[in-house]
Amino acid sequence: MKVTLLTHSRLSDEVKSLLQDKIDEYNVTDAQVASLACIRSCYSYKTGLEVLNDEFDKYFGEKGKEGTRLMNHIVKSGHTSTLENCFYSFAVEGVSRALLAQLTRHRHLSFSVQSQRYNKFSSESRSGGFDYVVPHTVKDEWVDSKLGKNVQENPLITFEAMMEEIQRYYDILISLGIPQEDARAVLPNAACVN
């Protein structure tokens, strides 16, 4: 798996120029500043800019416990939509569909995922076939099989053989004119996505 930061929350040049000295003094991120403005805008009669001008020291200064208290309050109260103004975009490569299924359960994350509908994963395509993730429990070692007495099997060899068979059947479906959006039904949860 490879993860690369593409972009993240950034204050406008106008706001940055107004607050640059304080941002440098307290060593806070643009995301922290944006969060303060958004959170306090919900609970104050002041505008976001007024909050930043008037309350910056209170929340980020030497007595910055107010900032910690405020964040804890927001999380405990479930008012986390105010934190959605902070964003980070990552390029994530080589993770399984199974991992993707777990990640997409989280409301605060948004995804743009390599499509198995619009991309061919046949051996003859530009992709050269589908890549896959081998679970860490699938080891390259010989173990006694529970399927028969005096039989040993290698989990890694078995796993890789299954991936080759799935690739072969996917290729057959594509060669029979089945659209990739339907042929993808045979691809495993171990198939990589970016």
Language-model features, listed with the residues they occupy:
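Family-specific signature for flavin-dependent thymidylate synthase
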Residues: 1-194
